[in-house]
């Protein structure tokens, strides 16, 4: 923000980006006008991350911490396509939503350092992630900023029912369930997502 000479901003974030946005909101509240999230992980999910029926969905979070994981996935274009393609198909409501763009995703992940950089995130937050699952994380102050959340109904990794505790962590959050989307609401329903973002930031106090 300083580098871009932006004194105050609105933030749009999804999944991993939501962790960053929540930290910014708690540490630099005066510089954030509002928060807009798609499928937002937050501490209130707690032990549900590791429920018996959900363990099969989070295996990759441990796999990414293996020192050879990026090398294995990036060992061949076909391997990378199979790996990344699995998540795009499985997490989207329409498994064909990314068919036209899959090769672009593979191109990006095969650039030097991109797989390892992404996988390193999981190593860097491993202790904090386990603390949340064990419900031993330090209390997180409630975010007192205008917040809007669109959550895909059919997301298998961040379940729509996990919106239940959002009001404990955000003041009066506006929560909308996107009935025809999975994990990638902004990609699966781009027109609706773009309109919601614009409408939200048009009315937050700047």
Regions found by a protein language model. Name each.
Residues 196-204:
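C-terminal alpha-helix
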Residues 181-190, 194:
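Catalytic histidine-centered segment of alpha/beta-hydrolase-like enzymes
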Residues 1-12, 16-177, 186, 198:
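Flexible "cap/lid" subdomain of the alpha/beta-hydrolase fold that forms the substrate-access gate
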Residues 97, 203-206:
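Conserved donor-nucleotide binding/catalytic region of nucleotide-linked donor-dependent transferases
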């Amino acid at each position: 923000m300083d580098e871009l000479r932006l004194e105050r901003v609105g933030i749009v974030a999804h999944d991993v980006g939501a962790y960053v946005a929540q930290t910014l909101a708690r540490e630099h509240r005066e510089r954030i006008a509002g928060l807009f999230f798609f499928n937002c992980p937050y501490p209130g999910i707690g032990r549900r991350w590791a429920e018996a029926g959900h363990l099969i969905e989070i295996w990759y979070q441990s796999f990414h911490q293996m020192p050879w994981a990026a090398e294995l996935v990036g060992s061949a274009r076909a391997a990378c396509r199979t790996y990344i393609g699995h998540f795009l198909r499985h997490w989207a409501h329409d498994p064909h939503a990314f068919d036209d763009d899959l090769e672009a995703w593979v191109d990006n992940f095969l650039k030097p350092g991109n797989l390892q950089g992404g996988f390193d995130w999981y190593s860097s937050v491993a202790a904090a992630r386990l603390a949340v699952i064990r419900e031993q994380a330090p209390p997180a102050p409630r975010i007192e900023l205008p917040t809007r959340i669109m959550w895909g109904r059919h997301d298998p990794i961040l379940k729509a029912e996990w919106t239940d505790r959002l009001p404990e962590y955000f003041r009066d959050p506006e929560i909308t369930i996107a009935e025809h989307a999975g994990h990638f609401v902004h990609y699966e329903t781009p027109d609706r997502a773009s309109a919601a973002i614009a409408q939200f930031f048009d009315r937050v106090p700047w």
